Amino acid sequence: VLMDEPLGALDKNLRESMQYEIKHIHESIGVTVVYVTHDQSEALTMSNRIAVFNDGKVQQLSNPSELYEKPVNSFVAEFIGENNTFNGEVSDISGDECKVKLSNAEIIASAISVKSKGEKTTVSLRPERALIEPSEKMDNMFSGKIEEVIYHGDHTRVRINLLGNPEFILKVPNST
């Protein structure tokens, strides 16, 4: 079954409800469904496997959690979900981690698609992975200036000028 943007004209609440309904029907009848969408959240919700295309070529084919947590390149990382990025140069590689030298700091990052020291690279960090004033010491602790705070109901979006990136975004869960 091919479904090409079937929920595009629906309002947000109905669209989300229909996503779950379609997923449950698909699972109960056991047929293969190719679901075409430009809505990344919808793709993550509806799919067992997701293919991300760029210029007609598959960039990554994997399950939703692997696609979101371990994108194979910067295109996939930026296409699926929000990202904060820093450009730098790999200064050290040790196992599955590397150090990336920025113009004003050094970041410890996962060594995804990193081949050698001296290589130019982009570090990506999801807004929900960053913390404001963590309770304990950890890697990659930097000071920044809060530029904007916007309440979104389930979370607060905080824009910070951090390490020369004036558009660094954090999503802070709101407590009950």
Annotate each language-model stretch with its function.
Residues 31-34, 85, 155:
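Secondary-structure boundary/capping residues
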Residues 1-75:
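ABC ATPase nucleotide-binding domains
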Residues 83, 92-176:
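Non-catalytic connector elements of ABC transporters
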Residues 63-97:
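ABC transporter nucleotide-binding domain
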